[in-house]
Amino acid sequence: MLVKIKATANIPQSKFLSLSEKFRAFVAGFGSGKTWVGCMAMCSHYWSNPKINQGYFAPTYPQRRDIFIPTIEEVAFEMGLRVDIKESNKEVHFYNGRKYRGTTLCRSMERSETIIGFKIGRALVDELDVMPVDKANKAWNKIIARLRWI
């Protein structure tokens, strides 16, 4: 089955998506599409690396709900994927039709002690700059410790 990808990226976003570095950052202003391009990278990863789970990290769970969930629903649809949001588990499951592609585990960086006990191949770290530096550093170190499949 051939899937038509409808999502588009601007030039800076396209450059970001083509980076091969282990750790990459899309640093831009308000409304520039940082979360959008991160979600594009997430969906692209599920197409090329099925069943390698990923993580999404935001300062708080309400930010995950308000920023990530609507964006990933839209981007996944545009990229030929369907998402099933498991609110109670803080997970997003990705499918191509009925074929399972992977799961994104969502965690709050505000409580970095919850960033333990799982393996992921990629991480989307959103809004890290709004956290106090010490909390951001602690969360970052916990997140990169979860990256076991890279």
Language model regions located:
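Phosphate/NTP-binding elements of NTP-utilizing enzymes
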Residues: M1-I150
